[in-house]
């Protein structure tokens, strides 16, 4: 029966949802083109080693062997292939690229998610300025505004915040690892046991509140100002504060939150990272951030980079269907092909009626509740 079923985690796409998805891809692609980004496209198959830095819990790539016995995978990520491309060509950064394509990740059984995901995004490579983050967030905000996505929440985090606090605490490697494991896993009882010996540390009041430091940006910044030394706020939080101010100026309708308790989505993130969702949504619509170690697996020289990726499937599910337009069939004799095609081109939701007789055309229109435009000469109708 396997020839009648799809592999777990895959689906066919057709009908109104497929149309919505294709229109969405076109809208996002045009936005990136108009913003001056250059198109880039990498192969669906890559060598497994390209994705060594990738760490996605509970997920594995689809894997196979090529004719030389080398392990190749269907790409589970679209950022690392761009790092591979830069390291193996004479392209000189900075570059501003946009892409659209599918990634494949074998998820846990019964997870309720799909293994094939369509993404569209941008990569700004070679830019150290905070303006690169702002450029990504600005493009995302404009696209969401164009799509009419309201009640959007954008959550900002910093991949270096936890490491900086741990350095300030001067923990040894084993203690730091145990601390991070408990903290990110939200194992609060273990976390409380780990911070108990630090009761005399000036950061102890902060450590007690840290697991709950997520939510409205103004509230979180006020708490941090009360709990942390000013140098920590200046060093690590200033970029977050500036980014929040930028977003509120550009997109006042956007709800911006801060989460200083979340683990970076990948180990190669080195600064601000973000994701967005709508009220009641269970998937991120877009995500991204800074990763200044982009080429670490490919060459000695590192490059600063910021990226943004839309989950096309998640966004598609948030968009309404286009208003129903009555289907219209256009029927004509073979000699009227050009006239019939011209009629289809100027009639909303019309298509050629590919049958041989008017009676068949009428039956097809009735079956699909469609209008029928008959171009055949009256004398040809018996």
Swiss-Prot record:
Heteromultimer composed of HisG and HisZ subunits. This function is generally fulfilled by the C-terminal part of HisG, which is missing in some bacteria such as this one. InterPro entries: aa-tRNA-synth_II/BPL/LPL, HisRS-like_core, HisRS/HisZ, HisZ. GO terms for cellular component: cytoplasm. Belongs to the class-II aminoacyl-tRNA synthetase family. HisZ subfamily. PANTHER family: ATP PHOSPHORIBOSYLTRANSFERASE REGULATORY SUBUNIT (PTHR43707:SF6), HISTIDYL-TRNA SYNTHETASE (PTHR43707). Keywords: Amino-acid biosynthesis, Cytoplasm, Histidine biosynthesis. Coiled coil: none annotated. SUPFAM superfamilies: Class II aaRS and biotin synthetases (SSF55681). Required for the first step of histidine biosynthesis. May allow the feedback regulation of ATP phosphoribosyltransferase activity by histidine. HAMAP family: HisZ. Pfam families: tRNA-synt_His. It is found in: Cytoplasm. GO terms for biological process: histidyl-tRNA aminoacylation; L-histidine biosynthetic process. Gene3D superfamilies: Bira Bifunctional Protein, Domain 2. CDD domains: HisRS-like_core. Pathway: Amino-acid biosynthesis; L-histidine biosynthesis; L-histidine from 5-phospho-alpha-D-ribose 1-diphosphate: step 1/9. This is ATP phosphoribosyltransferase regulatory subunit. One of its GO terms (molecular function) is histidine-tRNA ligase activity.
